[in-house]
Amino acid sequence: QELLLGIGGVRAIKRYVEVSGTPAPEVFHTNEGHAGFLGLERIGDLIGQGLNFDEALQVVRAGTLFTTHTPVPAGIDRFELGMIERYFSTDLLPGVEVDDVASLGAEDYDGGDPAVFNMAVMGLRLAQRANGVSQLHGEVSRGMFGALWSGFDTADVPITSVTNGVHAPTWTDPLMVGLVKERLGHYETSAADWNAPAITDGDLWSTRRAMRDQLVRDARARVKAAWAEENPGVLVPEWMDGLLDPDVLTIGFARRVPTYKRLTLMLHDEARLRALLTDPDRPVQLVIAGKSHPADDAGKALIQRLVQFASAPELRQRIVFLPNYDIAMARLLYPGTDIWLNNPLRPLEACGTSGMKAALNGSLNLSILDGWWNEYYDGENGWAIPTADAAGDEAERDKLEANAMYDLIEHQIAPRFYDRDEQGIPRRWVQSIRHTLSTLSPELSADRMVREYVERLYVPAAHAERVITQQEAYPAKHLAAWKKQVQKEWPNVAVAHVESGGVESPQLGDELEVRAYVQLAGLSPDDVLVEVVFGRARNG
């Protein structure tokens, strides 16, 4: 599959360029290691044009971006080296040697496994630019892949970040679009002035209520349909007509169900959750949707536990699990919830986009500070569940974070939602809705994400690719030869002597004169840059 995606994908693009007359792409963007073999196909083409492997590698690197989407090593594809031998010892890529391929994915660093081929490592070595998909994920990725840049401080590992975004026209409810069109005269919800007097608190609140009502009606229909399918010929129970309430604080949770997402964290204290759901004055209702991988038995067990809890007669109208989670369901679920819940184990959420889709519709987030929420939470657009990652064990961490979540719902979220004026409008809540729509809508859209990729990564990559291929790729040939020379001589390069002076007891702001005598072996002074790190020495 990965050969088909990477090599076949580039061949398909080349064929399309051929038949359509479209200019050939200058920049290639590899999303995760799965498509990493695209770089090898491009190297093969360049070898066919007269470059050697190392020279072709410089050209490919210049015009390639690699994006990692996983924050854990277990999420990376790794194969036995024998598979590389099997596929690349053929004529699949003429001129590309097996050893050269193997070297790109080799875990030849501290902590690596020399017996495997790592697709992400290959992707990083084939790309001059790399990024994670949120600021926190970029930080995690610099730590996870830091061994590839031996001697670098983690902060200096060359992996940046571009936070994901979502397609606003797809995920913004037509009722919100209609409100903007009616009051402001345009359809651009992400660029709307949500503080404009033309959009009143009553407008916002009635629209939010209508979207909640849509969700309730859809959930009832789905639950009834599922019942009828499982119980043919049996009347649908009357209680399903009262499933959920369009006037009750609604919390949504929907996504895949790997264990790190902690679907059942909300069940940590069942008695406390039951009290929140059945509170006579400030009730809460939960709408949960998701699906587990067919082979994920742990995920299936989480769903079964949740369904069992929700089947209790006193709870079944306040908590519902919607099976067969799909886009049609999601497009009503995100806008219809007042609160979007996300409680992964930090920092295992690379970015997450479900909360973004909810926020585009004025829903507020209740989330662990992970993924995108870590950088966008500002205290007014929702609530942050404190992270207990310093807890002694997983059970203690779950307990602390679950209790914090219950506290936020009971003491902050529900009181704000149900605090109504004489017109029945929760003014403070609507203020948070306005703030969320004003500040997050432009930032969470795919428009912002694409603009950031273009300006920060694609344009520089295209420029680098043009420069390195000038004069029949002379810069690539020169760079490859220079790297080879540096690698050959580097073991003999050493700092022979360092002198410092000018200040006996240096203080912050003082100037310190440093002179270093460096043994350059076969390199010239133009080949190196000498840097000074100043600080307290660490023994050992």
Give the location of each predicted region.
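Catalytic cores of carbohydrate-active enzymes across secretory and cytosolic contexts
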Residues: 1-540
